[in-house]
């Protein structure tokens, strides 16, 4: 079975709490024994995971210079979800909120969107197989544990998946600069999917045409667009605000 590295306290802790069987071995900074790390090391030992102490330089090299917070783990690659898993996930939510990312290829942006999605109670993130950042250590680290919690579904044909979900009552709201009304005028209270495109390019034509509604985020300054992770946070939490107000 293929394996991968994860690094950082949040990412390692999230996998340890939910899928401890994925751990192969762990590497920790030699001599570090603080209150944040020791409980994780104790749990790893209980699970029978081999722990190696390493110098900072060795850990830095393994993490390719990224901020590992003194811990790296080699784990089995998690099961990749696809369109066949969507129905089971939706069945767990009375009024599902989904996030669709069309063409978000930067791992930092994907990780930040996962973190937003977890905070907003998103049921799943849907991405196209051929136009999305891979799930890797960078995504997991930026997501601060959300990558191990929020289902990430990779689909072969995004527009077809959207149409299938529309038939099940999901309303698709896409973000586009050319939209005629803004997010604060849109109704975001029912079963909903918010669709975000890539920075610069936006959504692909077929994705945009498949959306039920197009909205924009009002911009008062000189910049014309926002980072996709910032924009997704704004949209998701406007949906959260409306849903809480409707209760």
From Swiss-Prot:
The encoding gene: rlmB
Catalytic reactions on record: guanosine(2251) in 23S rRNA + S-adenosyl-L-methionine = 2'-O-methylguanosine(2251) in 23S rRNA + S-adenosyl-L-homocysteine + H(+)
Functional summary from the UniProt entry: Specifically methylates the ribose of guanosine 2251 in 23S rRNA.
Species name: Vibrio parahaemolyticus serotype O3:K6 (strain RIMD 2210633)
Name of the protein: 23S rRNA (guanosine-2'-O-)-methyltransferase RlmB
Gene Ontology cellular component annotations, sorted alphabetically: cytosol
Family: Belongs to the class IV-like SAM-binding methyltransferase superfamily. RNA methyltransferase TrmH family. RlmB subfamily.
Binding site for S-adenosyl-L-methionine: 197, 217, 226
InterPro entries from the UniProt entry: 23S_rRNA_MeTrfase_RlmB, Alpha/beta_knot_MTases, Ribosomal_eL30-like_sf, rRNA_MeTrfase_TrmH, SpoU_MeTrfase, SpoU_subst-bd, tRNA_m1G_MTases_N
MF (Gene Ontology): RNA binding; rRNA (guanosine-2'-O-)-methyltransferase activity
Keywords: Cytoplasm, Methyltransferase, rRNA processing, S-adenosyl-L-methionine, Transferase
């Amino acid at each position: 079975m293929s394996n991968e590295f994860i690094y950082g306290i949040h990412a390692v802790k999230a996998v340890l709490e939910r899928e401890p069987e994925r751990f192969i071995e762990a590497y920790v900074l030699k001599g570090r024994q603080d209150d944040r790390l020791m409980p994780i090391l104790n749990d790893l030992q209980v699970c029978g995971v081999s722990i190696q102490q390493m110098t900072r330089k060795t850990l830095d090299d393994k993490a390719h210079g990224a901020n590992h917070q003194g811990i790296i783990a080699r784990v089995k690659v998690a099961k990749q979800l696809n369109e066949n898993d969507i129905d089971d996930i939706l069945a767990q939510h009375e009024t599902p909120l989904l996030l669709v990312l069309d063409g978000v290829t930067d791992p930092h942006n994907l990780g930040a969107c996962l973190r937003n999605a977890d905070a907003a109670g998103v049921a799943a993130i849907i991405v196209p197989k051929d136009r999305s950042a891979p799930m890797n250590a960078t995504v997991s680290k930026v997501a601060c544990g959300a990558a191990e919690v929020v289902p990430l579904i990779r689909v072969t044909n995004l527009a077809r998946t959207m149409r299938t979900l529309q038939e099940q009552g999901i309303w698709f709201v896409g973000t586009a600069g050319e939209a005629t009304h803004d997010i604060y005028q849109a109704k975001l209270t029912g079963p909903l999917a918010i669709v975000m495109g890539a920075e610069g390019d936006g959504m692909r034509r077929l994705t945009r045409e498949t959306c039920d509604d197009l909205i924009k985020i009002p911009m008062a300054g000189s910049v014309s667009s926002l980072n996709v992770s910032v924009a997704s946070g704004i949209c998701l939490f406007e949906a959260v605000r409306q849903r809480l107000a409707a209760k």
